[in-house]
Curated annotation (Swiss-Prot):
Keywords, in A-Z order: 2Fe-2S, 4Fe-4S, Biotin biosynthesis, Iron, Iron-sulfur, Metal-binding, S-adenosyl-L-methionine, Transferase
Domain Radical SAM core span(s) in chain numbering: 48-265
Amino acids binding [2Fe-2S] cluster: 107, 139, 199, 269
Entry keyword annotation includes Transferase: yes
Taxonomic lineage: Bacteria, Pseudomonadati, Spirochaetota, Spirochaetia, Leptospirales
Protein name as annotated: Biotin synthase
Recorded catalytic activity of this chain's protein: (4R,5S)-dethiobiotin + (sulfur carrier)-SH + 2 reduced [2Fe-2S]-[ferredoxin] + 2 S-adenosyl-L-methionine = (sulfur carrier)-H + biotin + 2 5'-deoxyadenosine + 2 L-methionine + 2 oxidized [2Fe-2S]-[ferredoxin]
EC number: 2.8.1.6
SUPFAM superfamilies xref list: Radical SAM enzymes
Cofactor (UniProt): [4Fe-4S] cluster; [2Fe-2S] cluster
Sequence similarity: Belongs to the radical SAM superfamily. Biotin synthase family.
MF annotations from Gene Ontology: 2 iron, 2 sulfur cluster binding; 4 iron, 4 sulfur cluster binding; biotin synthase activity; iron ion binding
Origin: domain of life: Bacteria
Length: 351
């Protein structure tokens, strides 16, 4: 075992092979060795900083797609509250709250196959207002996208678009049959051609093999994806995943290490399922990942911001703000929310 570990992690920097990725997931390499090497790469590109992302579910339900993992899919009978797209003012106020909560990036998510022209223009207007008035980094996840719509969003100031591959091409037909894997990769191609940074990741635990997880990690590398959210499957009411995988905290950390070592300079983000699957190893996972979500997910609650910040600091890391500065020590206190610290917020909204 030691010889195997030394062979895999002897060079710095190193991009591991598919075979080596499988050895990480299969437990051949000691977890501490995986973490040590993953942290070397994480620290090389991101130092001791952690980026907190906050999601805003701007439209819930009314989705014609049949993604088996999703509570919003058609005919899900999941009991989620459906609502149409929020107004620009509602989304803006959510962005204000995200900035107050120390978000590095504000992530807008809408259900559906993809936006039409009118919806794209509405989203563009909202994005431009948030970036201009709040000076925030924004990510949008709105489904399938062509190059023309991507260019509209780019001109509005969008610098990141999320469209997850979710799993390998080989496994994709097992989780969705209303659109293809090719359509997803074509969306990434449109985003790239428009000059928008690509955010694309996975949901592990949907009955895929270790080979599937390794394959999609390399697929994301081939697209040069700069932000990779790693979700751990949550069996929400109404899902149709036939054989969900058993995810232990150790395996989840190994998966994050593998993604880091295949995509060393990408932002690796701990996404949905952190609280339930990583559990006591949530802080340990930050030695591989440099980003996470806080304050909940689309239809599932998550850790609140103060708890998240405390975990980050307890592990020896520091939360990074969108302007590159570090979240002040007085975060969460009245003095932190002063007009001196947030002049742009007081300019547009009285607190």
């Amino acid at each position: 075992m030691l010889k195997t570990s030394e062979k895999i992690f002897s060079e710095t920097p190193s991009i591991i092979t598919k075979e080596e990725g499988l050895k990480i997931l299969n437990g051949v390499i000691p977890l501490t060795t995986c973490l040590d090497k993953a942290f070397q790469e994480r620290n090389r590109y991101f130092e001791n900083k952690v980026r907190i992302h906050i999601l805003d579910n701007i439209k819930n339900g009314y989705c014609p797609e049949d993604c088996g993992y999703c509570a919003q899919r058609k005919n899900a009978n999941s009991g989620v509250q459906e609502y149409p797209m929020k107004s620009e003012q509602e989304i803006y106020e959510d962005a204000v709250q995200a900035k107050k909560n120390g978000a590095y990036r504000f992530c807008m998510v809408t259900s559906g196959t993809g936006p039409n022209r009118l919806t794209t223009e509405k989203l563009a207007s909202t994005i431009q207002r948030i970036t201009d008035e709040l000076n925030m980094k924004v990510c949008l996840s709105a489904g399938l996208l062509d190059i023309e719509k991507a260019q509209v969003l780019k001109e509005a100031g969008l610098d990141r678009y999320n469209h997850n591959l979710n799993t390998s091409e080989n496994h994709y037909s097992e989780i969705c049959d209303t659109h293809t894997y090719l359509q997803r990769t074509q969306t990434l191609d449109s985003v790239s051609k428009a000059g928008i940074g690509m955010c694309s990741g996975v949901i592990v635990g949907m009955g895929e093999s270790f080979q599937d997880i390794v394959d999609v990690a390399f697929q994301l590398k081939s697209f040069r994806v700069i932000s990779i959210p790693v979700n751990f499957f949550i069996p929400v009411k109404g899902h149709t995943i036939k054989n969900p995988s058993v995810l232990t905290p150790e395996l989840c950390v190994r998966i994050l290490c593998m993604f880091r070592l295949i995509n060393p300079d990408s932002e690796i983000r701990i996404a949905a399922g952190r609280e339930g699957h990583l559990r006591s190893l949530s802080a340990t996972a930050l030695f591989a990942a440099n980003s996470l979500f806080s304050s909940g997910y689309l239809n599932v609650k998550g850790s609140e911001i103060l708890e998240t910040v405390a975990m980050i600091r307890d592990a020896g890391f520091v939360p990074e703000l969108s302007n590159g500065e570090i979240l002040p020590e007085n975060f969460g206190t009245e003095s932190f929310y002063s007009e001196k610290n947030f002049p742009e917020l007081y300019k547009f909204k009285k607190f």
